[in-house]
């Protein structure tokens, strides 16, 4: 049998990047990109092993951020800018988890989209 040449995947060395924290009411997703915006790694509360309503807890957001930070340090990342989007409960805990994992947080930016009276919002919950 002929040998097939497989290209060896080279892991890029990226020293600084952007951590996008998307915190919804149901889940928290942390995506780490380089300065251009190309995704390096990501993690969410669901991929961290949480199911159902536990995904919306601050601890689940913390675990997702820890997992994403561990993957990012394999790329050689040291400095990170954090962009937070959404009203979820995992926002602050995700930022502190990124700092605790050894990433140097340079900037925290709020990028939650706020409508200037755009679409009609969903109806209020009555519990």
Swiss-Prot record:
SUPFAM superfamilies listed in its UniProt record: Translational machinery components
Transmembrane intervals: none
GO cellular component term, pick one: cytosolic small ribosomal subunit
An example Gene Ontology molecular-function term: rRNA binding
Alphabetically ordered keywords of this record: Ribonucleoprotein, Ribosomal protein, RNA-binding, rRNA-binding
Keyword flag Membrane: no
Keyword Ribosomal protein appears in the UniProt entry: yes
One of the GO biological process terms: translation
UniProt-listed InterPro entries: Ribosomal_uS11 (IPR001971), Ribosomal_uS11_bac-type (IPR019981), Ribosomal_uS11_CS (IPR018102), Ribosomal_uS11_sf (IPR036967)
Subunit structure, as described in the record: Part of the 30S ribosomal subunit. Interacts with proteins S7 and S18. Binds to IF-3.
Family: Belongs to the universal ribosomal protein uS11 family.
Cross-referenced HAMAP family: Ribosomal_uS11
Function: Located on the platform of the 30S subunit, it bridges several disparate RNA helices of the 16S rRNA. Forms part of the Shine-Dalgarno cleft in the 70S ribosome.
Protein name, as recorded: Small ribosomal subunit protein uS11
Organism field: Rhodopirellula baltica (strain DSM 10527 / NCIMB 13988 / SH1)
Lineage: Bacteria, Pseudomonadati, Planctomycetota, Planctomycetia, Pirellulales
């Amino acid at each position: 049998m002929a040998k097939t040449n497989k290209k060896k995947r080279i892991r890029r060395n990226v020293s600084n990047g952007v951590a996008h924290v998307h915190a919804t009411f149901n889940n928290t997703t942390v995506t780490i990109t380089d300065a251009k915006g190309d995704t390096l790694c990501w993690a969410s509360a669901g991929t961290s092993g949480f199911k159902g309503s536990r995904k919306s807890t601050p601890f689940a957001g913390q675990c997702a951020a820890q997992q994403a930070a561990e993957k990012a340090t394999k790329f050689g990342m040291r400095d990170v800018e954090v962009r937070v989007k959404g009203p979820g409960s995992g926002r602050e805990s995700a930022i502190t988890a990124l700092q605790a994992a050894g990433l140097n947080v340079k900037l925290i930016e709020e990028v939650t989209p706020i409508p200037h009276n755009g679409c009609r919002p969903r109806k209020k919950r009555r519990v």
